[in-house]
């Protein structure tokens, strides 16, 4: 779905059947095909409050998510609708509509809490939908937010400093939007007009008092303010006062609805399309459709096993799958590019190695782009090994191509020579001189042939070796030569053969040196790109930590200004810990990166430093090539 999904209607993503949550595999298959980044908008709220209408409007449809026209809740579980994003190219908008909270027909109310928590975990923009006003009752109905500390974990194990795990929610929680339907009040505070956002923030202020009822009432307010740093509010008038139209609102054209409601709905939709963020995990990991599917499966499996969905565990699960795919993607890219760019046989080994270096550099960049949380660079090492093996295949293919091409040319050039030998044309007085002149012409013509490849000398050397016995026979039978002249000719032939063997050995040593230099270059390129990635990840981590600190400080200062000194003081330990984390990230980056790079260098050197392994592969391969393509001479 690179060009964007074409879902004509929503599909259930998480089924809620008999108090059991199940992931719908058909929905996962749809997400698997979406490799684009996703903007995920989820809506939750009490049943029969018009959530589905808003989501249909975001999808640009009158109908889709079931609206229902009775007091029964229509939506069960979490439903999904993937549509091309209207304003972000190459992004998919994923709309999640959840079953109504507080439905008396449902059995275990715990499922409401899980649906709420899953929506928070899966989306990048979280919409809470309620009716009439944000008052004490509305906030009490939002008690699900207070349960998130029991239903979601950031880390798989408790923090050693004892600071609550929920302090890190702010680093990965979605933006929060409260939509208030059928709003009839005036937006005023103490006689002065206020904005919708100011209305929400005023409603979220804590109430003074220490009795249990006040504390219970304050808890949802406190959780929203602490967990969701970016908050927004939209109010909506009643769509129409006509009960018949309301009962069939999915069939009603917008023109039949209240103009003010239309305007408010359009403003809301425009905000979502413009400001709803791409879904990301901690440290800036971008979520695509297929990654979203993996997250959904991981979280629901955790719920069904009796565990608490944990972001850290989910990211590890996701990384295992994604990094394996990144290895394959990068290796495939390398193979495709080499196949496209290399014309076999290459004139020199260096030409092939330069092409390899360019394709490998691009493939490493692809691996880096699509991998994350590669603990101990396990997958990078797999990628390196895979690329090294593929490079070996290309080297062998290059050698084989060179052998075939050179043999074909030599067959062609030596055809006359072989026919003359068979006809006994050189078995005459002066035949040796004639034979040598013919052979020298073949050699001159052979070296004039362009792009013979890396085995040109070796193939010709084999040709010369095949002629040794023939030349000896012609020489000894040539009655025009004296014994001394024959002896001189034999010595000259041996000397020339030794020189050519020396040239061949020199070429092999040079190629071995080129291969070792190429391996060293490959190692340095891998380390350079890893270093850049580690530095970027550290910068992203630092930004997240600073954001968490600044948000926590803002909440703390708000408590103080609102007269809650005890709450202000309770947050000191939290803030101190954030500052320590930031100091560690700032000051310990160089040793940490250096240690990682040194370790990788050692391990990759072990992988790559098989010059004998790779070069031996080449040398061994040559003898097998000659067996495979036997010389006719």
Curated annotation (Swiss-Prot):
EC assignment: 3.6.5.-
Catalysed reaction(s)?
A: GTP + H2O = GDP + phosphate + H(+)
Residues recorded as binding GTP, renumbered to this chain, are 45-52, 67-69, 97-101
Question: Where in this protein does the record put region GTPase domain (Globular)?
Answer: 1-310
- What GO molecular function annotation could you give as one example from this UniProt entry? GTP binding
Top-level taxon: Eukaryota
Give the GB1/RHD3-type G domain ranges.
Answer: 35-277
The record's top EC class is hydrolase
GO terms for biological process, alphabetical? cellular response to type II interferon; defense response to bacterium; immune response
Annotated disulfide bonds? none
Return the SUPFAM superfamilies for the record: Interferon-induced guanylate-binding protein 1 (GBP1), C-terminal domain, P-loop containing nucleoside triphosphate hydrolases
Q: Which GO terms describe its cellular component?
A: cytoplasmic vesicle
Q: Which InterPro entries match?
A: G_GB1_RHD3_dom, GBP_C, Guanylate-bd/ATL_C, Guanylate-bd_C_sf, Guanylate-bd_N, P-loop_NTPase
Give a yes or no for keyword Nucleotide-binding in this entry.
yes
Q: Give the main location.
A: cytoplasm
Compartments annotated for it: namely: Cytoplasmic vesicle
Keywords attached to this entry = Antimicrobial, Cytoplasmic vesicle, GTP-binding, Hydrolase, Immunity, Innate immunity, Nucleotide-binding
Record PANTHER family:
GUANYLATE BINDING PROTEIN
Q: Which family does it belong to?
A: Belongs to the TRAFAC class dynamin-like GTPase superfamily. GB1/RHD3 GTPase family. GB1 subfamily.
Q: Which function does this protein serve?
A: Interferon (IFN)-inducible GTPase that plays important roles in innate immunity against a diverse range of bacterial, viral and protozoan pathogens, such as bacterial pathogens Listeria monocytogenes and Mycobacterium bovis BCG as well as the protozoan pathogen Toxoplasma gondii. Confers protection to several pathogens, including the bacterial pathogens Listeria monocytogenes and Mycobacterium bovis BCG as well as the protozoan pathogen Toxoplasma gondii.
- Protein name in the entry: Guanylate-binding protein 6
């Amino acid at each position: 779905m690179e060009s964007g999904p074409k879902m004509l209607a929503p599909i259930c993503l998480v089924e809620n059947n008999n108090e059991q949550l199940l992931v719908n595999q058909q929905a996962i298959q749809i997400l698997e095909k979406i490799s684009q980044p996703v903007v995920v908008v989820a809506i939750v709220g009490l049943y029969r409050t018009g959530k589905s209408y808003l989501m249909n409007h975001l999808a640009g449809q009158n109908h889709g998510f079931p609206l229902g026209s009775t007091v029964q809740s229509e939506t069960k579980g979490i439903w999904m609708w993937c549509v091309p994003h209207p304003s972000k190219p190459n992004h998919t908008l994923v709309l999640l509509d959840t079953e109504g909270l507080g439905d008396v027909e449902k059995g275990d109310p715990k499922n409401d809490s899980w649906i709420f928590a899953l929506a928070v975990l899966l989306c990048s923009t979280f919409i809470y939908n309620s009716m009439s006003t944000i008052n004490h009752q509305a906030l009490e109905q939002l008690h699900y937010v207070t349960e998130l500390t029991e239903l979601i974990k950031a880390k798989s194990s408790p923090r050693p400093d004892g600071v609550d795990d929920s302090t890190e929610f702010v680093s990965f929680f979605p933006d929060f939007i409260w939509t208030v339907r059928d709003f009839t009040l005036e937006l005023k505070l103490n006689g002065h007009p206020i904005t919708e956002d100011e209305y929400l923030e005023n409603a979220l202020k804590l109430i003074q008092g220490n009795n249990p009822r006040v504390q219970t009432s304050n808890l949802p307010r406190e959780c929203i303010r602490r967990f969701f740093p970016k908050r927004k509010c939209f109010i909506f008038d009643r769509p129409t006062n006509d009960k018949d139209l309301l009962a069939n609102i999915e069939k009603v054209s917008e023109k039949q609805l209240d103009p003010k409601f239309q305007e408010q709905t359009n403003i809301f939709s425009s905000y979502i399309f413009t400001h709803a963020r791409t879904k990301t995990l901690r440290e800036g990991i971008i979520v695509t459709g297929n990654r979203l599917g993996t997250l959904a499966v991981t979280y629901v499996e955790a719920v069904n096993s009796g565990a608490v969905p944990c972001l850290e565990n989910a990211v590890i699960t996701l990384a295992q799958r994604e990094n394996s795919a990144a290895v394959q993607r990068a290796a495939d890219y390398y193979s495709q590019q080499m196949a496209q760019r290399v014309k076999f046989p290459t004139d020199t080994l260096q030409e092939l190695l330069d092409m390899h270096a360019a394709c490998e550099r691009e493939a490493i960049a692809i691996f880096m782009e699509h991998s994350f949380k590669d603990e101990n660079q396990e997958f990078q090492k797999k990628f390196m090994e895979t690329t090294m093996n593929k490079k070996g295949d290309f080297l062998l293919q290059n050698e084989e191509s060179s052998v075939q091409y050179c043999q074909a040319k030599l067959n062609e050039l030596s055809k006359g020579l072989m026919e003359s030998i068979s006809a006994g044309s050189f078995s005459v007085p002066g035949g040796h001189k004639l034979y040598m002149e013919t052979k020298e012409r073949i050699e001159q013509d052979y070296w004039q042939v362009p792009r013979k490849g890396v085995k040109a000398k070796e193939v010709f050397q084999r040709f010369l070796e095949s002629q040794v016995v023939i030349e000896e026979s012609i020489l000894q039978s040539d009655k025009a030569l004296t014994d001394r002249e024959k002896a001189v000719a034999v010595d000259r032939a041996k000397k020339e053969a030794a020189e050519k063997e020396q040239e061949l050995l020199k070429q092999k040593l040079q190629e071995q040196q080129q291969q070792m230099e190429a391996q060293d270059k490959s190692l340095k390129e891998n380390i350079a790109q890893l270093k850049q990635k580690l530095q970027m990840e550290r910068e992203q981590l630092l930004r997240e930590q600073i954001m968490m600190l600044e948000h926590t400080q803002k909440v703390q200062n708000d408590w103080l200004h609102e007269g809650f000194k005890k709450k202000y003081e309770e947050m000191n330990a939290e803030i101190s810990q954030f500052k320590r984390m930031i100091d560690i990230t700032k000051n310990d980056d160089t040793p940490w990166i250096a240690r990682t790079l040194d370790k990788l260098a050692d391990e990759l050197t072990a992988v790559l430093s098989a010059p004998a392994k790779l070069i031996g592969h080449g040398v061994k391969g040559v003898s097998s090539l000659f067996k495979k393509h036997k010389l006719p001479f």
